Amino acid sequence: MLVHPQFNPIALDLGFFQIHWYGLTYLAAFGLFYFLATRRIRQAPYASGSGPAWTARDVEDLLFFGVVGVILGGRLGYVLFYKPTYYLANLSEIPAVWKGGMAFHGGLLGVIVAMALFAHLRGRKFFEVTDLVAPCVPTGLAMGRIGNFINGELWGRAADASLPWAMVFPQSGSDLPRHPSQLYQFALEGLALFALTWFYGHSRSAHVGADGRPIWGRVSGLFVGGYGVFRFIAEYFREPDSFLGLLAFNLSMGQWLCVPMIVAGALIWWSAGRRRV
C-alpha cells in the first residue's frame, strides 16, 4: 500500500509571484495541443483538402477560441450540473473560478460552441474543425489528471489494501487505501483516447467514404463516444462528489453525463458517412 506524497502545489515561489504545478499542467496542455494541431494540418486530409489551406495562425486562433470555451463552459457546467442550488443563492460566486469548480462536460459544450463560431467566422465546415481538434485534446486531458494527482484531489473510492498500487490520500481525511483514480483517468481519457483518435484520424477510412468521397465527423464521433466510455469506466473507481453521492442505478453524475456522450458519439460517427460534403 502506498501513501500519496503530498506534493507542494507550488512549483516555483518568487515571493511576489507563485507558479503552481496545476497551472503548469494547463500550460503543457495548450502547448501539446498547438504542437499536435500544427503537425496535423501538414498531413492528410488537411494538407490535401480542397478548402482554404490551414496555417499555424489558424491553429493559434483556434486555441484561443478553445481556451475561452473551456473556461466559460467548464465553469457554467459545474454551476448547472453539480451545484445549481448553491450558486443560485450565491450568484456573485459564479465567476470565482480561482476557488475551484470546473466540469469537463460543461467545458466540452463550451468548446463545441467555440468551434462552431470559429467555423462560421472562417467559412469552414464544423466537423472539419472538430476532426482537427479531437485527436489533439486527450494529451491535454492527461495533463489535467496529472495536475489532479499532484494536488491530491479527486481521489478514488476505497480499495482493497492488498492492491499493490492502493494509495492513502491524507487530503481525504481518512487513512483508507484508495484507487489512484486520477492515474486511471490519465491512462484512459488521456493516453488510450489519444492513441485511438490520433491513429484513426490518420487513416483513410476516417475521412473517405466507401464511394470515395470525403467525409467529416467520424473522428469527432470517436472522440465524443470514446471519452464517454472511458470516463464511464473510470467513474467506477473515482469517489463520487460528497455533495451528490450516487444517483439513480448507483451511477455518479459523471456517469450519467457520459451516457448522452456515448449515444451522441455513435450517432455522429454513423451519420458522418451519410452526409454529403
Curated annotation (Swiss-Prot):
Biological process terms in GO annotation: lipoprotein biosynthetic process
Pathway of action: Protein modification; lipoprotein biosynthesis (diacylglyceryl transfer)
Annotated GO MF terms: phosphatidylglycerol-prolipoprotein diacylglyceryl transferase activity
PROSITE patterns reported in the protein's UniProt record: LGT
Membrane-spanning segments: 16-36, 62-82, 101-121, 214-234, 243-263
Swiss-Prot/TrEMBL keywords: Cell inner membrane, Cell membrane, Membrane, Transferase, Transmembrane, Transmembrane helix
Localization of this protein: Cell inner membrane
Chain sites annotated for binding a 1,2-diacyl-sn-glycero-3-phospho-(1'-sn-glycerol): R145
Membrane topology field: Multi-pass membrane protein
Lineage, top ranks: Bacteria, Pseudomonadati, Pseudomonadota, Betaproteobacteria, Burkholderiales
Group of enzyme by EC: transferase
Signal peptide per UniProt: none
Protein name per the record: Phosphatidylglycerol--prolipoprotein diacylglyceryl transferase
Protein function: Catalyzes the transfer of the diacylglyceryl group from phosphatidylglycerol to the sulfhydryl group of the N-terminal cysteine of a prolipoprotein, the first step in the formation of mature lipoproteins.
Pfam families documented for this protein: LGT
HAMAP family referenced in this protein's UniProt entry, alphabetically: Lgt (MF_01147)
EC numbers: 2.5.1.145
Record PANTHER family: PHOSPHATIDYLGLYCEROL--PROLIPOPROTEIN DIACYLGLYCERYL TRANSFERASE (PTHR30589:SF0), PROLIPOPROTEIN DIACYLGLYCERYL TRANSFERASE (PTHR30589)
Ligase listed as a keyword: no
